[in-house]
């Protein structure tokens, strides 16, 4: 294996281990789920106008002026 292939394998392994340690057992297995997680921040994460929040959350300002994705209330 060359260096680039080893790097990619290590990156994939680290991503899988990180997902398991974070408790994300219900991660969507389809391609759209992977794409959505890559482009939108989840709940309780900082957000910006260029990166909209994931479905079910919206960008709300906190008292410190920082915007966070918060779960929508029914």
Curated annotation (Swiss-Prot):
PROSITE patterns the record matches: J_ACTX
Compartments, record wording: Secreted
- Which tissues is this protein detected in according to the database? Expressed by the venom gland.
State a single Gene Ontology molecular function.
toxin activity
* Entry keyword set: Calcium-activated potassium channel impairing toxin, Cleavage on pair of basic residues, Disulfide bond, Ion channel impairing toxin, Knottin, Neurotoxin, Potassium channel impairing toxin, Secreted, Signal, Toxin
For the site labelled Important for the neurotoxic activity, the residues are 39, 66
The residue range of the signal peptide is: 1-22
Main location per the UniProt record: secreted
* UniProt comment concerning the protein's domains: The presence of a 'disulfide through disulfide knot' structurally defines this protein as a knottin.
Family, as annotated: Belongs to the neurotoxin 11 (kappa toxin) family.
Report the protein name in the record.
Lambda-hexatoxin-Hv1e
């Amino acid at each position: 294996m060359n260096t680039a292939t080893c790097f990619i394998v290590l990156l994939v392994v680290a991503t899988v281990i990180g997902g398991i340690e974070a408790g994300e057992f219900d991660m969507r297995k389809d391609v759209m789920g992977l794409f959505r997680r890559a482009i939108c921040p989840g709940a309780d994460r900082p957000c910006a106008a260029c990166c909209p929040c994931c479905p079910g959350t919206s960008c709300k300002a906190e008292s410190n002026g920082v915007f966070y994705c918060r779960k929508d209330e029914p």
